[in-house]
Each structure stands twice: as structure tokens, then as C-alpha cells.
Amino acid sequence: MKARVNTCAVQQSCLQSSALGVLGSIAHPVGRPGEYSGRVMQGKSQVAEFSLHAGPDVDATQVTIDLARIAGSPLVGQPYKAHKYSVNSDGYLMLFVSEGLGGFWVQLSSQGTYRSRVVFDSRRLKSGDLFIATLIRPGTHQAKMPRAVAAIRVRAPEASDKAFQPPPPAGMTCTKTGFVPKRLEVYATQGIVFGFETTSRVQIDLTKPAPARSAKSRRSARWRGRPDIRR
């Protein structure tokens, strides 16, 4: 069986919390019991809808939605396919993209008796939200908020006969005055969890790729998908 290579992940040099792709995911704390509706956008186009029930009696503490899997334009005059989820009201809504070019963002609205109200917009992450980025290309990267920057150095795994097991995710905090810390060093595929103390968004660009190494000095660093932030 041939191994499936996610070319979008391998080639990606820019990650944005406001336009999710295969190397980024978002965790949002639901916070309150209720009925919610979600609108999935890709660029300026709506591509999916979903409903979310949150209650203290629900066992699941996390609901995970693959935006690439549920995306799809309905036939003219037809509604979007129904996607229904449930989660404990103290749990998390996890958004990620498994394949494709990305560019997704989500609005979540609470359903009131007379009107709905937007309670979450993934383009503007707030206190309690998490943006999880997985950088797989060695080199120097720059993390940016609207008025702040930070440097991230991504190291390639050392040569070895054993498969590389990345360390637990590293952490960065987005504050009103900038990133904390302002410099970070991680291994390829390790994962970085961005927490938020202020409303913002994060973009990460590869600014200086590491020099190519010979085949003998390379160690296999397989991207296994989203890092486990519970470790």
C-alpha cells in the first residue's frame, strides 16, 4: 500500500488562525448550555452549516469538526446537509482541516427565542480560545499579530534509525503588548499552542527555510496530524 502524502501540509509556508488550513486547528470553550448554529465559510463563500447542542448532561467534553469533510455547496434551492453535534457545556469545540487548500473560518451563533446572536468568530480569537499550529518545515518562521511579531525556529530531527517522536506542544501567549515569549524553538511536527489574553489573530510565515540536508543525515519526521494538547 502506498503512503498517502498530504501535499498541502508539506508545501504550506503560511498558517493563519483566521483562515484555517491543514496545519492549524482551533479549540473554543463552549461555556454555556444552549442551542447553537454554526456557519462554515471558505473565503467569502458559505460551504456548510451545523447545529450544536451544549448541555451539562452531555458526556462528550470535546466535539471535533473537520471543516474540509463537511464543506460542500448544496444544489440550487436546496438546504445545506444537516450536521448535528453535541458537547458538554463545559467542553470544547475543536475545528480543523484534514485536506485541501484551507481558508476556512467559522461563526457560531446562540439560538434565542426571537433572534440569534454571534458568540464566536474564528477570525477573532478571544480569551480562552486556543490556536494550535504544527510547523513541519525547518527554518526560521515569524509569528505575527496586528501589532506584534515573534521569532520561531523550527529544528529538523537528528538523524536516527528510529521514527521521530515529537515532544509535547510548546506554548505562546498573545497579550495586549505582544507575544510571550518573543522567541521560541521547536522541532518539526512538535506543535505550538497559542493562548489568548486579548482578542486577536495569528499568522505564521516561513521567512528563511533551513538548508537542505543530505539523505543520510535526515531523520523521518512524519506529520501525524494535530498534536495532542491534553498531554
Predicted regions and their residues:
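Extracytoplasmic copper-binding redox domains, predominantly the cupredoxin/blue-copper superfamily
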Residues: 1-231
